[in-house]
Amino acid sequence: MSGACSSYVSAEQEVVRGFSCPLPGGEAAAVFCCGFRDHKYCCDDPHSFFPYEHNYMWWLSIGALVGLSTAAVVLLAFLITACVLCYLFISSKPQTKLDPGLSLQTTGSKEMSPDHHGLNTAIPMEVPGVSSPRQSSSSNTHLESNKKQTVSPTCLPQNQFMATVTASNIPGSPDEISVPTPGPHGPVP
């Protein structure tokens, strides 16, 4: 680079005449012409691109490095936390499939095939004092014939249901589940 800056048109569209470096009243060490096509100035470093002191640029660079490194650390911590939580979630799941509980099946007199033995089976049970769905038509006629009878407040009509008990091969589970028998007037409050 030389010490002579040619004329140029500034960003404000003003024509600036050429000048030689160093400028009168300027720094004696600024012997080079630096800058861009729309802004030229005298400088002491021919590879300088901005008319700022180097200290300002170093602080800007250090701030950018600190900001980027902080962002990288936060992102890395987030990724590690997500991976650890996924690992803990997957490793804490039980390896065997558990029995979901009572199964809803229609009651009937179907025999089970031999390949279904040992699996969860629904055993229809009749609870004393409660009629099954198959007996609902006969109980409706019985209720219609007794419409004129008075019902005591302790003996209210009850819904009809069929209890289904699921048996499974889980170690430690009871083989039989006892079903409480309600009294003649229903459960005691």
From Swiss-Prot:
Disulfide bonds: none annotated. It is found in: Membrane. It holds the Pfam family Shisa_N. The keyword Transmembrane helix applies. Keywords: Membrane, Transmembrane, Transmembrane helix. Its main location: membrane. It is a multi-pass membrane protein. One of its GO terms (cellular component) is membrane. It comes from the Eukaryota. Residues 140-171 have a biased composition (Polar residues). The chain crosses the membrane at residues 48-68, 70-90. Residues 98-189 are annotated as: Disordered. Belongs to the shisa family. PANTHER family: PROTEIN SHISA-LIKE-2A, SHISA. This is Protein shisa-like-2A. The lineage of its organism: Eukaryota, Metazoa, Chordata, Craniata, Vertebrata.
